[in-house]
């Protein structure tokens, strides 16, 4: 078609957020490694873990998000001035994407980005990160005020907001809380001003789990490295990437994160970190994983090593651990007995199963792509209270609610 519906462009940009397989290896290889969330998999150990820079890999997030999401959003914003609600939703997601890219890369083209076809500017200037964040705050406030001023339906919405202008307004206000807190160490007065302004903004903020904002995905087959199908954004590609593409290299939990949560008695630890026998990890059906977390813990309580997370920069086979005997893990013993030809006790699978990985529940194709949640709001309010900002409730109460 000679004219593209701006709502179709909104759908594309929203789905790409978590659905673009082509860029997700950068999250796994670098971002999760630098933050010491993951370790052990070949990619994260050899790139972030070993501090091995690969420009083409590190540039993927920018190259893909800019060429697809940003360009579509800017073009659709330009052509949807007679669609106030859709235009506002497009502006909100552009603000989300610009903040994301600036958080990763720092100074980026923002105010002039994506305008080449519109005004001929093929060399947009780089805005400083401060300018990017000021742009984001301004856009979120303006877009929230614009919502509800038209009668058009946000038909391209594929999020939990479900085309509801009041939900989009609430979402925009809530994002302001996040970005205000992000700058609180470098611009504390500006941060407090933006935060407190968002709290009292028309439309309110997310105030329950039912109001969480996320992109919806479907239970579609994983695309893996399937050529043109990488442009199919309907499944959660980040979940696919975290799951892994072969039995030997899923995303193991880094010892830094694991031990911190363990020391703090964090009740979320075993919701996030699980131990599996997963000889079928190369297949797209996640049902081929046998959860043996409780059995590995019991083995540790009876003199075995128990759960052994991977250390920073190590592959899962580094700092080699002695696997439990087949008889120590009842599920393993049962599988070996029932299916001796499948090699459950071979190829070092028993050694790998005591390395905790990300729970498969977070790796399904239809897992939601989180934009912002009520839990994060409560943590932000807790931090604001601890800073002495003008928020109701104590830091302790907000933290525990989160």
Locate predicted features.
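Structured, solvent-exposed acidic/aromatic patches
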Residues: 40-93, 97-402
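Acidic, glycine-rich segments characteristic of secretory precursors and extracytoplasmic regions
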Residues: 1-36, 46-50, 59-60, 70-71, ...
